[in-house]
Amino acid sequence: MSAEGEPAEAVAETPANSPGEEAAAAAATTDVDVREEQRPEKQSLSASMCRESHWKCLLLSILMFVCLGAVTWCQVTSVTKLSFDSSLKGRSMIYHGSPCSDGYVYIPLAFLAMLYVVYLVECWHCHAKSELQNKADISSVHDQIQRMRQATPCIWWKAISYHFVRRTRQVTRYRHGDAYTTTQVYHERVNTHVAEAEFEYSHCGIKDISKDLLDLERHPATKLKFTKCFSFANVESENSYLTQRARFFTEIEGLDDYMEAREGMQLKNVDFKELVVAYVDLEKQPWYVSHYAFWVAALFMLSWPLRVFIEYRTAHVHYHIEKLLGLEYTASSTGDEPIYRFRMPRVSTLDSTELEWHICTNRQLIPSYSEAVLMDLTDASLCNGYSSCGYRGVLQACEGCNRASSSSSIFSRHAIHSCSGGPSHLSLSTSRFSLCQLHGSHRTGLWRSRSSSLADRGCQDERCCSYSSQLALNENPPTYHDARFFPVLIVHRQEGCQTRNFCLHRSSCMETSL
């Protein structure tokens, strides 16, 4: 009774914790990282045979033992033979002898010698492959794991824009002993643009959640396979990753016909090795992994059993280096994010017969940045009602053009408004679709436009004729980015024209017609 009462008294004398202290203790417990544990697994004999079968060595060993069995059978077995001798006046003679006495024993011996040479070559290849493995002791492995845990990840993307070029070459072929030259057509890949980027996760926060690796010293040898991966703690950080990734590939998507996308994760300032064999003591390895044991077993054609035994005595573990993103996520302001302009890729127009025909038959010259800067500033009074007309261009006729043809004009994204306040006058005979870059929305819209003849809205209009041979430029030339991605396209017409009338496009639209 007294023994049971003493603890009760001790409990009664212990002061109760205040609510503030309990909350602090709970917070401290929460802050402590509780990591999961991972241990190497020793596999069974059948599992080790399935993991590393060494089927080449096994097949060669079986064939060599079959040849040895055939030679042994020739030496041990005795059969009854019947022979005729002419010196004995045609009498037959019965005797016992080896079934391979007539030279048949050399057939399995020849096969055995050939297979033995191939077997030794395979053993040398396996030994060289084993020597190339990364070997380390347990302390070095733990240090390497600690460095990978503390390393900062780099989640990268890489995009390669390319197209195929049709080429020809002369090839010499032979037929019935005669040499002749033919022309071979082949397609060669040409890389035109390579871009790289990485995920900006400074607003997400990062934490390593890899498991604790224990009990490596309990096994004489352990094969470790390392894998890098990352995960997200919340939906916001995942959306940030997907948004940056989509923006990067969208920027590169339309630069050429095809795009090769790559992505991955690297650990900065860490020499990452995927496969490592860890020993308790690197200087004193087990006897069965020594060079002498391997080659002695190979000479006696016992290399395959030794390999299975080594695999059986080796433990395996697949260790993941995992980084968790989004623990300290803070929403980034819209102004800090870079502005991406989504352009229509080349392959997106393949389903449109009209746009495809227009792309193949256009006659356009894109001025360079230097040419755009050196253009004269003329007639600034054209732009009334809009202070900054933007980077504009006019259709300049080549030495006379009499009939309307298909043309397109892609202007600056600042030219969505009409400078004169009136409707734009287009020089197209029949306008079906307009693919416009909306100012301020960074989106591409596709809608139907009105269809009319050239006589209704043609260059006979006085306002249109008054704009002839005019080039409206703002005082400040465009930036290099605008000049590159939003050029002024000047359409040159091939056929003659009696009147030198010009039509000014005042919208950043691409007009097409059949």
Curated annotation (Swiss-Prot):
This is Transmembrane protein 151B. GO terms for cellular component: membrane. InterPro entries: Tmem151. Keywords: Membrane, Transmembrane, Transmembrane helix. It is found in: Membrane. Residues 1-40 are annotated as: Disordered. It holds the Pfam family TMEM151. The chain crosses the membrane at residues 57-77, 104-124, 286-306. It is a multi-pass membrane protein. It comes from the Eukaryota. Belongs to the TMEM151 family.
